[in-house]
Amino acid sequence: MLYRIARAGIFKLDAEKAHDLAIQNFKRFNGTPLDIFYRQKLVSKPVEVMGIQFKNPIGLAAGLEKNGECIEAFGAMGFGFIEVGTVTPRPQAGNDKPRLFRLIEAEGIINRMGFNNLGVDNLVENVKKAKYDGVIGINIGKNKDTPIEKGTEDYLICMEKVYQYAGYIAINISSPNTPGLRTLQYGEALDDLLSQLKEKQKELAEKYGKYVPIALKIAPDLDDNELSQIADSLMKYKIDGVIATNTTLDRSMVEGMKHAEEMGGLSGRPIQTRSTEVVRRLKELLGDSLPIIGVGGVDSYVAAKEKMVAGADLVQVYSGFIYKGPNLIRDIVNNI
């Protein structure tokens, strides 16, 4: 009820201004009596995935907590894990504004943010300071001005810097808002990236005496042959997990709605069915060889359960959280 009242005011603001205001307030309220508006104690639903113990299988997807500024606040809401980022080697401003749009009637969001972030060094400092007893995943990407043929270098730089502070590392090669990025999902480019990531993981595991899993985040806009090739590469290079899916470029499910023609990736309820189909197909292709983190349109415990029945070991929320608030986490955890 409280969130519904707050949302009415928040949704009168520009979407990005509302996001920035929320982050500022979470930072300001955390640890004060005002955090009662979002703090909630949930039942424990522990699960082990990628060799990591999660206190529950519901996580915050990357993109909302880009710089790791208020990890404790999201932890207080009951998330079993929080994925921060996407972060790049160097700070970057991202794409021109406006770049974030609500499709309220569809409970969707279109973004063309472009990996705006304060850089990997800033993120690492925030993660080091965070007092959160859950799992922190760190989502890494490449800078916009790094040529795509040198993109792997950016991932390796980020991986080296975040490794000892991450519960797991997510490799984002599926954002539609960085030119050329999605080409890394295919053929030799993917194999070269995964090969070098695994080599770096082995080197860092020996250096720090701990094994940090890596998970590949893929797009929903892949046909069956492309999914099959990705699955083969994931197994070939013994990648620890796959995150399905990122946002879509498809607009067929929101045609005619306000903001539907905006460039960028569409998330939320409109991609619920497609992302679940990708999870199901990946499960058929991968079997039990590696776990799947399902994300895309998870806006209720029913939607979360559908992802898990399709084959997801963990699920993440983003757009559903924007529309439903912290109670969404409680509803999913209590009923999953």
From Swiss-Prot:
* Positions contributing to FMN binding: A62, G63, L64, E65, K66, T86, N139, N172, K217, T245, G268, G297, Y318, S319
Q: Where is the active site?
A: S175 (nucleophile)
Pathway(s) it belongs to = Pyrimidine metabolism; UMP biosynthesis via de novo pathway; orotate from (S)-dihydroorotate (quinone route): step 1/1
Q: Which reaction does it catalyse?
A: (S)-dihydroorotate + a quinone = orotate + a quinol
Q: What is its EC number?
A: 1.3.5.2
A Gene Ontology biological process in which this protein takes part is:
'de novo' UMP biosynthetic process
Q: Which cofactor does it need?
A: FMN
Q: Where does substrate bind?
A: K66, N111, R112, M113, G114, F115, N172, N177, N246, T247
Question: Main site of residence?
Answer: membrane
Q: Please, which domain of life does this record's source organism belong to?
A: Bacteria
Q: Give GO cellular component annotations, separated by semicolons.
A: cytoplasm; plasma membrane
The keyword Iron belongs to this UniProt entry's keyword annotation = no
- How is the cofactor bound, as the UniProt entry phrases it? Binds 1 FMN per subunit.
Q: Is the keyword Oxidoreductase in the record?
A: yes
Where in or outside the cell it occurs: the entry states: Cell membrane
UniProt xrefs under Gene3D superfamilies: Aldolase class I (3.20.20.70)
Q: Which HAMAP family match?
A: DHO_dh_type2
Q: How does it assemble?
A: Monomer.
The task this protein performs is described as: Catalyzes the conversion of dihydroorotate to orotate with quinone as electron acceptor.
The cross-references to PANTHER family, in alphabetical order and at most eight, read: DIHYDROOROTATE DEHYDROGENASE (QUINONE), MITOCHONDRIAL, DIHYDROOROTATE DEHYDROGENASE (QUINONE), MITOCHONDRIAL-RELATED
Q: Name the family.
A: Belongs to the dihydroorotate dehydrogenase family. Type 2 subfamily.
Q: What is this protein called?
A: Dihydroorotate dehydrogenase (quinone)
